[in-house]
A protein has these predicted regions:
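Short, surface-exposed loop/strand segments
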Residues: 70-78, 97-98, 152, 157
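Alpha-helical substrate-recognition element adjacent to the catalytic core
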Residues: 1-81
Length: 158
């Protein structure tokens, strides 16, 4: 798989990613974190980050600091991999005896239109997973929009 950091390092570039293991001056986006605080106990909450794996500890520590129980959150460092591809793999790995995925709803909060487009393309109508989606499957994307002094959510569906 394409990894620009690894590929540049193989060419001899020295790349210092140590800052990515630190959560610096985070700004809580309460329109999202308030929702996270109210997820039911039977839901599975994942935090997908494009950062590398060593950032997961600081991210989880930050969630605890803002009173989100990090033990109920599963972090995934995609390391630049497509978030849509990660979701496809997750769905394929959670197959029930009836041949359908046990993931029947994905709520995805994202500020990057590029990432939103990727997820919509790979989840909404993908022949690779269409037949394993449960009949009641829902993908609900919320675009996180920064309006200067506050954030809003724009709902996007397949």
């Amino acid at each position: 798989t394409f990894d620009p950091v690894r590929d540049l390092q193989e060419l001899g570039y020295k790349i210092d990613l140590s800052d990515f293991s630190i959560v610096k001056n985070p700004l809580e986006i309460t329109v999202v974190t308030d929702i996270m605080r109210n997820f039911t106990d039977d839901s599975r909450t994942y935090v997908l980050t494009a950062r590398r794996g060593d950032s997961l500890g600081p991210i989880m520590d930050y969630l605890d600091q803002i009173e989100i129980n990090s033990s109920q959150v599963r972090p995934i460092a995609t390391q630049g991999e497509s978030k849509g591809d990660v979701m496809v793999v997750m769905m394929k790995n959670k197959i029930m005896p009836n041949g359908k995925s046990n993931i029947n709803r994905i709520e995805y909060y994202e500020d990057s239109q590029k990432n939103i487009d990727d997820v919509l393309q790979k989840i909404c109508d993908n022949p690779e997973i269409n037949d394993i989606k449960p009949d009641n499957f829902e993908l609900i994307v919320y675009k996180v929009i920064n309006n200067g002094d506050r954030y809003n959510l724009q709902k996007i569906e397949c």
